[in-house]
């Protein structure tokens, strides 16, 4: 991952000579640095979550209220802060880490049904906006995250 001085993750600097090597190193090291990694929906959608999803196929699927937790024996998690449910994943893992979507209650039920069909965990951390304290409490309670 490369970041410009103004915090952008894409732009002209992406063509710099060492960008490829730095990106490869980042992908190799991140899973080794702790039991969890966090990213925003923009980054996830740009680099990882680009599957084609037909949400119409999920409109009649019943979805239980509440968080959906899938345990991971490896204990490595990628928390994606995706308050509106925009990330379309191919499967439940990215870079060897299990994906956990951190959502708000504004997410449509078709998206929740899709996540469940892929065995992708999700937690609700706010009504309209994400509440950092609530998301951290749930990360610790459900997944044992301390980093």
Q: Can you describe what each PLM-predicted range is?
A:
Residues 3-5, 12-139:
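Active-site ligand-binding patch in enzyme domains
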């Amino acid at each position: 991952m490369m970041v410009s001085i103004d915090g952008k993750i894409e732009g002209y600097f992406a063509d710099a000579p060492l960008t490829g090597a730095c990106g490869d190193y980042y992908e190799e090291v991140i899973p080794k640095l702790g039991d969890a990694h966090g990213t925003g929906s923009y980054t996830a959608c740009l680099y990882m979550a680009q599957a084609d999803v037909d949400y119409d196929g999920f409109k009649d699927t019943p979805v239980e209220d509440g968080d959906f937790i899938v345990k991971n024996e490896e204990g490595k998690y990628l928390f994606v802060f995706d308050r509106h449910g925009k990330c379309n994943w191919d499967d439940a893992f990215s870079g060897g880490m299990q994906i956990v979507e951190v959502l708000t209650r504004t997410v449509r039920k078709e998206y929740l049904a899709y996540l469940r069909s892929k065995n992708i965990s999700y937690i609700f951390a706010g009504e309209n906006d994400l509440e950092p304290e609530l998301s951290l409490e749930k990360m610790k309670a459900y997944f044992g995250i301390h980093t």
